Regions:
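Glycine-rich phosphate/pyrophosphate-binding loop at beta-loop-alpha junctions
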Residues: 1-48, 89, 93-115
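Active-site-adjacent helical/loop segments in soluble small-molecule enzymes
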Residues: 39-97
Length: 115
C-alpha cells in the first residue's frame, strides 16, 4: 500500500493514468514526498501486484505528526507522518486482527513546530 499527500500525488496519478505522468506538487510534505513524476522502476513495482494507493490531506498529515509527538515522543517530519495520517484519519482501516507496520524515517523537522 502507498500513502501520498493529496497535494503531491505522483504515484496515485500514475496509477489512474496507467503510466507515469507529471503532477503539480505543493503542501506540507512536498520537500520529502514531492516528486513531480513517479519513476519507471517504482511504477513497475507498484503495479506488479494490485496496488492500493491512498491520499491524505495536509491537515491530516500535521495532525498525525502532532499525535506521533504527543503519544510516542517521535519527532517526525511531515513526510514521515503521512502513512500514520492514513491510519489516524481513516483513509486506511485495517481488517480485524490485521498487523500494521509503519516505517518512520526522516530528520527534516523543526522541534519548535511540534504540538
Amino acid at each position: 500500500m502507498t500513502v501520498e499527500p493529496a497535494r503531491a500525488p505522483s504515484l496515485y496519478a500514475a496509477l489512474a493514468a496507467g503510466r507515469p505522468v507529471d503532477v503539480e506538487v505543493s503542501g506540507v510534505a512536498a520537500d520529502s514526498l514531492g516528486a513531480r513524476r513517479v519513476g519507471e522502476i517504482a511504477f513497475a513495482m507498484a503495479t506488479a501486484s494490485p496496488p492500493i494507493s491512498l491520499l491524505v490531506d495536509d491537515e491530516e498529515i500535521l495532525r498525525a505528526r502532532d499525535l506521533m509527538w504527543r503519544d510516542y515522543r517521535i519527532a517526525a517530519e511531515a513526510g514521515a507522518a503521512t502513512a500514520y495520517a492514513a491510519l489516524t484519519g481513516g483513509a486506511y482501516r485495517p481488517e480485524p486482527n490485521e498487523r500494521v507496520a509503519l516505517i518512520v524515517c526522516g530528520a527534516n523537522t523543526d522541534p519548535a513546530t511540534l504540538r
